[in-house]
Amino acid sequence: MNFGTSGSVQINAGESISYVDGLISSVLFADKTERHYLLEGTINACNSLFYKLEKDLGIPHKQMNWHHRCQETETDGIYVPSTFGIAAPYWVDHIKTISEGYGNNLPNEILRAGMESIGFLVNDIWALTKKHLKVLPQHIVASGGGSRPPLLQFISDLTGMTIYHSAMKDRTALGVHLLLTKAHTGQWSNVQSDYEDSYSPRMKKKMKDKKINKWHSALKKAGVT
């Protein structure tokens, strides 16, 4: 997974072509002897969502620190962003913004709900993927400037997977290096990627199910599903 201005969840689908309605299918790697396929779910707004909320809520940029605010905040509220539309796995653009159900800790609860909307979309992508792949990853690696602790913990809680935060800031560059090495030598480079932190599920199932049900109800209200 990578979270920057936008976000992406990429899954190695193996050597068999895999088509999943709602996800992007493409070739991950190919040469004369082998071909591997990729399933990808894209998220239109990650950091860009917080830039928008910063402006909408009148929060000075230096005081934003959304990850600190979200780390210290819980909410029963739900936020479905409409400005950027919803990409995977729904692919809709003209929808209604849903922002409701907050307590008294504003604007932090809105920021938390905005962050959770990213996690919900990751979980929806992951839930769809699980139905179609025979071999699933044992853990998930996250990179990018938006891969902050509260978001990664929330994704772990929803998916039930351990999330590792990559110590390597630019994993795109690593991918280019690996492909070029393979093209020139015929062998994959043995590159070890270290992890800074890991996040394991800790949310109770009752709470998780309640949150996911609220999210899907909000998607219907917004005209997404």
Which residues does each PLM region occupy?
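Active-site core segments that coordinate phosphate-bearing ligands/cofactors
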Residues: 1-141, 147-225
